[in-house]
Amino acid sequence: MKHNLLLAALLSSLSVGCYAADAVSGATPNHAAPGSQIKNVDAATSASIVPQKLRISAKATGFTDSKAKKVLFVVGDPRFDQSLEGFLVNTAANFFLKKGYEVEIRDLYKIRFNPVITPENFYHAKDGFGQTPDDIKPEQALVSKADYIIFCYPNWHDSPNAITKGYMERVFSKKFAYQDTPKGLEGLLKGKGIYTIMNAGWLGGGQGNVGDGIGKLDAVWDKYLGAYKVVDDDTAGFWGAKNLGRFVNDQSPSNLNPQYQQKLQKLASVLDARLERDFFRNK
């Protein structure tokens, strides 16, 4: 709850409404056309649909007992197999697979993950009391094995969407992700890295993190991403992990752009470069 309030306060200071005209430019056609004439177009949200012929996949290895580094993707997108967010996830998964890492992709909608903290499981999630719920045990086992946890979701309300946030709250429970000590709370996921991949449609200001603006309102872009960094640092630190940053795609190819394929390929190249920087060069 405190993370949501903090993020809301930080982002509200950016006067997002001032940029409303730009906010839809990435995913909304600039001219009207009958729906029957437009295929695979999502003109209402920033989670754009990728034309079927341009979609990619990743053959996740799952986790073994080998000493290979392990990356856990936690994906909260109901259209993962079609969306631009899904394209980013699969691009990132293939990036790590090529480096010999083991990859596990948890499609939260596909596995029908229940994000709701109920009165019955509240005290386990918040206080670590009682038995770990059966649906949480396999998720905690994956988190325990992972060297990196990457949260992936479309930007709908400037925070993790409900299913992703619920995963954080239920899986990263007390006595698993953190505990009380005489000196205060202690994170228990030391040595792990946390990262976020988020598709957006706000300013059209950049691809990446702070400093990755494209010359369009860079100061606002950096302030926007700086607000996320405050929350990401706090969340990772709460668990004892390290925040490795986030990749925000705020340059979604317009669905009707005649150069859509080239822009999509460029987006994949930019994501690869940002991952190389954030996971390997910045160590």
Locations of regions flagged by a protein language model:
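A short beta-strand-loop structural module common to alpha/beta enzyme folds
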Residues: 102-112, 247
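Boundary at the C-terminal end of the N-terminal hydrophobic targeting segment
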Residues: 18-20, 25-26
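N-terminal beta1-alpha1 ligand-phosphate binding loop
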Residues: 57-101, 241, 267
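Positively charged n-region of N-terminal signal peptides that target proteins for export
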Residues: 1-4
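N-terminal beta-loop-helix "entrance" segment that forms/cooperates
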Residues: 108-129
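Glycine-rich phosphate/pyrophosphate-binding loop and the adjoining helix
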Residues: 42, 46-57, 61-63, 217-283
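Bacterial N-terminal signal peptides
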Residues: 8-15
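Helix-loop-strand module that forms the ligand-binding subsite of alpha/beta enzymes
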Residues: 130-224
